[in-house]
Amino acid sequence: MSEPRKLEVLRAIVEDYVHSREPVGSKALVERHHLGVSSATIRNDMAALEDEGLITAPHTSAGRIPTDKGYRLFVDQISAVKPLSQAERRAIQTLLEGSEDLDDVLERTVRLLSQLTNQVAVVQYPHLSRAMVRHIEFVLLAPRQVLIVLIADTGKVEQRVIDVGQELGDDALAGLRARFLKSLAGTPLSLLPQALPAVVAGCEPSRRHAAQALARGLDALASSSREERMVMAGTANLARSNVDFPLSIGPVLEALEEQVVMLRLLSDMAQDPRGVTVSIGRENPYDGLAEASVVATGYGPGSSAKVGVLGPTRMDYPTTMAAVRAVARYLSRILGP
């Protein structure tokens, strides 16, 4: 069998199995695809593909299904990621551009991506090691109670209510806010702990106790901003594809719930020349994802954070890759350089 025909037969098997979820036989391939050869020839071709470990027979079925190796060869033959339709691109743009802050952007992103792909969508929060302070706001809620708002240049907003330990008026709090903002605007969040003592020391002695409390609050907010987190949506899609996980869907759900597993997997996925990385079945380093595939790409400054989907290995890879790439591009555009 020639290499082009081998790839053509494999492509037809993958497409039919993804569409029907049924093992594929030679007769069906001849009827559905213009392969230009007889059913007997296709049977021989399928036997050769099976010998190479690219397809296999589930149980006693007469048909064949792709193996992880077969899916890998199929994905590797996708020379370029196809663009989404104009309607799909417009829907992405409309939904994401209505977002108000980073949390809202990422929540909308995973909901949209799970709808486009019918898989579980996941997105890492941008790595904030290089994020800087854009704005600080102090809001007086009661004489001793202040709402602290910290906004990073990535759009991330962190806030908490603290007791400043002494009574403050609006004017006094406004003065403290002005001092903190003037001193800290543009400061990397990672350097905030080192910068805060000097700000407190420069405050009037009568307000230093409150300034120390505000500094502790800002430090805590900066620390929570630096924690690695992700957002996901579409876990119900896994339940609908339960039959695609013959062993058990439990380990997949555990991997999603134990966010550190997914965060590590996403972080370790190298960028593919096509812009989208695919990890199939047992290529995943976590045993619980041996029956799953992950399609992801980077977004934002340096493309260091990832957005992607997780689903069964029986996945529409071309469509999924296109959706992931398109959403990542819009996400990067919204978040800016």
From Swiss-Prot:
**Which Gene Ontology molecular-function terms are recorded?**
DNA binding; DNA-binding transcription factor activity
Which parts form a coiled-coil structure per UniProt?
none
Superkingdom of source: Bacteria
Could you list this entry's UniProt keywords, alphabetically sorted. Answer: Repressor, Stress response, Transcription, Transcription regulation
Its family remark reads: Belongs to the HrcA family.
What this protein is reported to do is described as:
Negative regulator of class I heat shock genes (grpE-dnaK-dnaJ and groELS operons). Prevents heat-shock induction of these operons.
Q: What is this protein called?
A: Heat-inducible transcription repressor HrcA
Lineage of origin: Bacteria, Bacillati, Actinomycetota, Actinomycetes, Micrococcales
